[in-house]
């Protein structure tokens, strides 16, 4: 059976695409935008396998009224690049001027966008794969191939107190995690939002800060970060904390049969979506009520059906192997998913 080999080239840039000055020279692992973009600039960070986090500044005042005569240099400028000792697998914003990075060299770094300085917060025992910042609890969370989940004190007021708060053992490697809700609400903002749990019916967001952790072996843990943060505070104060206080609120098995590639929480705060290497996405909800759980679903995506005489993906057949019987599906891994804030 021959294995299809893609002969496609990347699509050409359109008139509305922006070409980044001095782009990353390796595979881009993550792209994030400043949490509270303020005119006239928006900060963007791109982590890469070229051992760097690249910092770009987007001129939003120009891009809003951009014309064909506006050059990319007027829209995007490269501010700096933060060098690491190994490929960088993830990056997240903490404030508009402070970010954190996850690297194969096992270290958790803080990146000061104003001064260009880097601070090593701590390290794991194996490659650091994912990290997220929870603004409600002021916790930085990191997940690693060492099967550990770590919570860090960034200490924005006193950098000398920054360091490790707590490390929890996981049953498998942490390959995905996210904070719910992913877009913090502004003070007093009660604008309804649409959710997959109630199609076509806007309802208030669930503001409960949760951490969703996806692992190899299809494990999914869900933590309520408010009681977890309280347990961390009690332990830091010298109090004894029961083992049950460190346990997740929910232990689940992924609806997807194959390993996850990404996990993102819904803006509504009531669920999350996961993607897999087998071209599928699953949508799940936190509420354990059977009626709510009955609404979870999964769907296929990023697939192409190849029929007889229409096989644009196969370049050639390896000698000695049989041709694949048509029709068949070419399945692509879903490496990344994202929700629009609204």
Each predicted region: which residue ranges?
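Beta-propeller domains
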Residues: 43-74
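Conserved beta-strand element within WD40/beta-propeller blades
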Residues: 44-48, 99-103, 140-144, 211-215, ...
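Beta-strand-rich domains and repeat architectures in extracellular enzymes and scaffolds
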Residues: 20-51
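Short loop/turn segments immediately following beta-strands, especially the blade-tip
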Residues: 57-68, 154-159, 224-241, 283-296
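Loop/turn segments within WD40 beta-propeller blades
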Residues: 31-41, 91-97, 131-138, 178-208, ...
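WD40/WD-repeat beta-propeller blade N-cap
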Residues: 20-28, 72-75, 81-88, 122-129, ...
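Short coil/turn segments within WD40 beta-propeller repeats
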Residues: 26-29, 49-54, 86-89, 105-109, ...
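WD40/WD-repeat beta-propeller blade-loop signature
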Residues: 27, 40, 84-88, 98, ...
């Amino acid at each position: 059976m021959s294995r299809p080999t893609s002969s496609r080239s990347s699509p050409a840039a359109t008139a509305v695409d922006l070409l980044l000055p001095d782009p990353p020279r390796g595979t881009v692992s993550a792209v994030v935008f400043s949490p509270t973009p303020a005119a006239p600039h928006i900060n963007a960070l791109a982590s890469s396998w070229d051992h760097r986090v690249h910092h770009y500044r987007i001129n939003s005042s120009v891009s809003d009224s951009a014309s064909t005569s506006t050059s990319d240099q007027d829209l995007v400028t490269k501010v700096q690049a933060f060098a690491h000792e190994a490929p960088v697998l993830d990056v997240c914003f903490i404030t508009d001027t402070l970010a954190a990075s996850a690297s194969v060299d096992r270290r958790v770094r803080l990146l000061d966008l104003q001064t260009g300085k880097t601070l090593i917060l701590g390290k794991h025992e194996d490659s650091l794969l994912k990290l997220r910042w929870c603004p409600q609890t002021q916790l930085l969370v990191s997940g690693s191939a060492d099967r550990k989940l770590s919570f860090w004190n960034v200490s924005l007021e006193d950098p000398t107190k920054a360091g490790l708060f707590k490390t929890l053992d996981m049953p498998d490697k942490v390959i995905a995690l996210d904070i719910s809700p992913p877009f913090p609400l502004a003070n007093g903002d009660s604008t309804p939002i649409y959710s997959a749990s109630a199609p076509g019916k806007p309802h208030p967001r669930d503001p409960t800060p949760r951490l969703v952790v996806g692992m190899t072996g299809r494990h999914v843990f869900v933590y309520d970060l408010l009681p977890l943060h309280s347990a961390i505070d009690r332990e830091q104060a010298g109090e004894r904390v029961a083992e049950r206080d460190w346990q997740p609120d929910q232990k689940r098995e992924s609806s997807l049969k194959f390993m996850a590639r990404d996990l993102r929480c819904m803006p509504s705060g009531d669920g999350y979506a996961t993607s897999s290497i087998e071209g599928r996405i699953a949508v799940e909800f936190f509420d354990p009520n059977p009626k709510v759980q009955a609404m979870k679903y999964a769907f296929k995506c990023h697939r192409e059906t190849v029929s007889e005489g229409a096989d644009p993906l196969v370049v050639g057949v390896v000698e000695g192997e049989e041709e694949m019987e048509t029709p068949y599906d070419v399945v692509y891994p879903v490496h990344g998913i994202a929700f629009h804030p609204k």
